[in-house]
Amino acid sequence: MRTALTVAGSDSGGGAGIQADLKSFAAVGVHGCSVITCVTAQNTRSVDSIFPLPVDEVTAQLRAVLSDFAIGAAKTGMLYSAEIVRAVADALEGSRFPIVVDPVMVATVGASLETRDLAAALSRQLLPRADLVTPNRYEAERLSGRRVRSLADARIAARRISSLGAGAVLVKGGHFRGELVDLLYHEGRFTEYRSYRYPKELHGSGCALGASITAFLTAGDPLRVAIERGRQRVAMGFATAYRAGHGVEIVNSHAIVDRHGIVRAVEDGAAVAARIIPLAWTPEVGVNLGYALPGATSLADVCALEGRIIRVGERLQATGPARFGASRHVARIILTAMRYDPRLRSAINLKYREKNRTRLKKMGFALGTFAREREPRGASTMEWGTEQAIRRLGRVPDVIADRGGVGKEAMMRILGEEPADVLRKVRRIVRGA
C-alpha cells in the first residue's frame, strides 16, 4: 500500500499535529507512518506544555520507518528546535521521495511552538531538501526576513524562500485581511488560489493542508495537482468543521464525502425538474442541474447531467447520467457563488423573461443581474457575470439573470444549498408566474 510519512508533534487534543496528519492520510487512502518530535499537552483553548523528545529517539523512529517502509512522500510539521531539524534533515538526506515542509512556529491558540534557533535551522538544513514549503504569513516573514502585509509582499517573500533551495513555496492566505488567497511560487511563476474566508479560527487547518498535499503526492499526483486537491480537501474540512472542546473548532481533516449520494441527488432532482418546469421556461440549450462537493474548487468537484434536460415532443426529459465534471456553465456559477457563500452548492438554469423581474422581487427572491455586453474580453462569462451580480447586490442572490446577447439566450440561474432547495424555489417561481 502507498505510504506517507509525517514528522511532527503530538496534539493531545487530537485536532492538529500527528493526529490530524494521520487522519488526512487515511481520508485520501494512503497508509500513514509517524515520527513524533514533541509531546504537547494542549486542547482547543491552550498549549499547556511542550516536551521535546530526545534527539536520539527522533532519529531512532526515523530509522525504523525508513528502513522498512517504501515512503511515497513525507511531511514535516512541528520540529521545535534546531537539534531536531538537524536530525530530521540528516535522516532524509538522499531520499528520493517528495518532502513537504510545514514550518510550524505558532499554534492556532497563539502559543509558541519553537525555540529561537528554529527558523535559521530550517532555512539552512531542511528547506534546501524541500519540494514544497507551506508557510503562513508570519512564518513567511521569519523565513524571508521581511515584513509580509500584502499579496505583493507575499510574492517577494516566496521568491526569497525559494532562493533558499525549496522547490516550491505556497504562502497560505489565512492570516491576511480581505479575500482569502493562497499564493504558489513554482518554477518561476506565481499562481493565486482564491476561496471563501470563514469568519473564525479553526484548529488544524495548516496540518490538514500539508498532510493532504503529501497524501496526494504519495498517490502519484504531480505537485500542482496535489496542491489543488489538497486545498479542496481542506475546504471540505472547513465546511464540515466541528466543535469537540470549549475553544476553537477543529477542521474535519478526515472528512469523506458521499459522492454517490451527490450523483443520486442530481439524478433524482433532474427527474423532478423535468416534471415541474414548463416547456416555456426551457432554454433552447436545455436545462442543467449542478451540485458541488463541500469546499469545491474546480469543475471536477461539481456533479451535473451529461446530457441536460431537453424537450422531447411535448414534455421534458433528463438525458444522460449525472457525472462529476460534466458541466461548465452551471458549474462555474456554483464555484463562483461558493467563494462568497460555501453553503450554496447547487444551481439550475432556466429561460429568463424580463417580465419576471418584478414578480421575483415581490415573491421575496433576491435577484442579481449582469449585462453580457460589458463583459471584458477574455473573461469567462459565467464567472464574471456571477461575480458582478454578487458584488452589485452585496451577497449571493437567489436568482442570477441576464438578458442575453448576440446568439445568446436570456437566462436565469436559481441557486440553493442542494438540489431539493433549488427545486423548491423553482416550484415557487413557476407557480407564481
Residue ranges and their predicted role:
Residues 1-6, 18-109, 253-257:
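Conserved N-terminal subdomain of the carbohydrate kinase-like
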Residues 7-13, 190-203:
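Short pre-catalytic strand/loop immediately N-terminal to key active-site residues, enriched for Gly-Thr
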Residues 19-24, 141-142, 200-223:
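Short, small-residue alpha-helix embedded
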Residues 28-33, 191, 216-230:
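Phosphate-handling active-site elements
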Residues 52, 225-281, 286-292:
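Charged C-terminal helix
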Residues 116-190:
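Conserved phosphate/ATP/ADP-binding segment of small-molecule kinases
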Residues 261-372:
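Extended, low-hydrophobicity segments enriched in charged/polar residues
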Residues 354-433:
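C-terminal binding/interaction regions
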